[in-house]
Each structure stands twice: as C-alpha cells, then as structure tokens.
C-alpha cells in the first residue's frame, strides 16, 4: 500500500496527540504497517495478496480504561475497592470508496453485525511482506457514527467511522528470528458481562 511522506507525518502527529490525551489504551496504524478490515457482507477494494476484497484503512485507534470506584467519601473512607472496566470504542479512518455508502446505511439504520469483524495488522516491506502480527476480532458490532472530510489535505476524501462491539479478542503473534510465526498471545473481553472470554 503506497503512503506518501506527508501522510506518514500526519500519522505520527495523530499518535502523539492521542498519547497526550491519555487514552487508556491506543493502537494506531504506522507507516510500516498495512491495516485491513474484514467485514462480513462488505467487499473492499484491496488487491494486496492475501487480503483481496478487504477494506484498507489509514488509521486505527482503540481505547479502554478501568475507573476506580471509592466505597465512600469523607475522612474515614478507604481506598477504592471496586472498578468499572470500560471497553471503549474503535475509531478508524479510511478513504471514501465503494464501501462508504454501505457503512453510511448501517450507521443510519442501526444494523448490528454478528461478526466476526476482523482488523488485521500486517508488516509491510519486511523480508516476509504482509506478515500478520496482530488481529482484533469483534462480535455483535455496530458502526455508531461516520464523518467524511478531506482531512488528508489532498484530493482524497476520507471518512472516520466509530465502531462499537460487545466482544473483543486481541491476538498478537510474535515473529521468530527465523522469520516464522511464534506462539500467539490472546486476550478476550465481553463488554456486556465485563468478564474475560
């Protein structure tokens, strides 16, 4: 996927701003990463080998946090004994394409997708091109909002889509010195029951 230097600088700046805001957890697509979205029933424009028909993304941001809850107030109140995990949401940016009217329709109709909806992070330009090292799989997914703009400053219109889901599964696959995949590390969370999967 071709990305010019001006886009690289904007991505770096965007990441710095997000970190400054102190989000609980964030992940943003970098210049050395190709980022793809696989959404059941939606055909994207990607022609990248292994990701034909996927949706190519410009950036991805995820937040999660855990808010401590104090048992009481006043002089005798002890330290927080409970907490409230918040799954947060996923915000993606993509170029306007044939999938744009579909996402707009899903936002306005409030349609929920059972899933799985999968975000794939793949290393680009390495000795093993497009090697997947991180995936985020969602179930019971709904696009909550969509905003279109020319924020990249060129002739391309982009759109920012906020996605919410009931279940998240995060999987990181390390790369061995030989270039092959290592043992995947996964964590899943159910946002409805607030329990690990």
Residue ranges and their predicted role:
Residues 30-197:
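Glycine-rich, low-complexity intrinsically disordered segments
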Residues 16-25:
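Bacterial N-terminal signal peptides
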Residues 11, 27-28:
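Glycine-rich, low-complexity segments
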Residues 1-10:
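N-terminal secretory signal peptides that target proteins for export/translocation
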């Amino acid at each position: 996927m071709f990305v010019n230097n001006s886009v690289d600088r904007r991505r770096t700046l965007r990441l710095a701003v997000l970190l400054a805001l102190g989000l609980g957890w964030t992940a943003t697509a970098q210049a050395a990463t190709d980022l793809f979205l696989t959404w059941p029933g939606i055909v994207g424009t990607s022609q990248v080998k292994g990701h034909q028909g996927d949706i190519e993304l410009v950036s991805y941001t995820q937040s999660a946090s855990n808010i401590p809850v104090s048992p009481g107030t006043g002089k005798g109140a002890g330290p927080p004994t409970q907490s409230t995990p918040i799954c947060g949401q996923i915000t993606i940016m993509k170029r306007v394409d044939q999938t744009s009217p579909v996402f707009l329709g899903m936002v306005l109709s409030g349609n929920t997708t059972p899933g799985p909806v999968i975000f794939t992070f793949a290393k680009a330009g390495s000795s093993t091109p497009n090697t997947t090292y991180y995936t985020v799989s969602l179930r019971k997914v709904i696009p909550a909002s969509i905003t279109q703009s020319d924020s990249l400053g060129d002739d391309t219109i982009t759109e920012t889509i906020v996605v919410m889901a009931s279940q998240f599964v995060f999987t990181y696959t390390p790369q061995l010195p030989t270039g092959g995949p290592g043992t995947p590390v996964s964590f899943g969370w159910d946002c409805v029951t607030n329990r690990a999967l």
